[in-house]
Amino acid sequence: MDEQVLRSLIKWPNVPDCFDWLALDRRGQWRMRDAFAQQNKLPGQVITHLALNEFISRNYVCDHLGRYFFQNGPQRVFITLDATPWIARITPSAEGLQLVTQCHSSIEPSGALSDERGNIYIVGKVHQLIYIQENQFFKEDRETVALLHDHDLDHFSQLAKLRKEACSYGGSWNWKSKQLPLDPIRSNEIASRFKFIAIPSD
């Protein structure tokens, strides 16, 4: 978390929380949802400003209830999740392929899930900021779930051995010479299984 953010929390400790104004879409884009977007159930405007995107990513936090928020100075801006708290991309690097979130953090995968709509979710550990209480934060590697970006589905299919299941696909996939499980899941089970709140409220 940015030092200036921590200082502002000490200086202004009782700023009201903000809900519904910021969203994370299925492609890992932050979206600003003004009053018109909220009233008309629109996705909102994609934030394209590079510095603002980086600022949000550095100060992206999860609380004990499973609500994700952006610590914007002294104010917590809770984030509506279109899918999952993290969106994964398969990216090349000098060490080979990497799984990276929208916040540029690495995912250490332990498996994957496939739902009835053909979505793939990467299960694994992500180094993330956790809010405890009274402006106390810590970082830890926590198991979570990340929707795989749809541009990487073809690449994933090349790594996977699939078998048809009742509602989706199961099987395994190869990641860095390891065979990891691919299990079926229903999309409406994702949030409860991984203990996050997609539409946070006060």
Predicted region positions:
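Glycine-rich, aromatic-bearing surface loops/beta-hairpins
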Residues: 107-109, 113-202
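Generic recognition of long tandem-repeat/solenoid scaffolds
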Residues: 31-32, 69-71, 99, 119-124
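Charge-rich alpha-helical segments
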Residues: 76-88, 95, 130, 137-140
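Short, well-structured hydrophobic secondary-structure segments
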Residues: 32, 40-85
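Surface loops and adjacent helix of pleckstrin homology
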Residues: 27, 35, 73, 81-83, ...
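Residue-level detector of beta-strand structural context in well-folded domains
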Residues: 20, 68, 110-111
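Surface-exposed beta-loop interaction hotspot
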Residues: 84-116
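Long alpha-helical, hydrophobic tracts
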Residues: 1-54
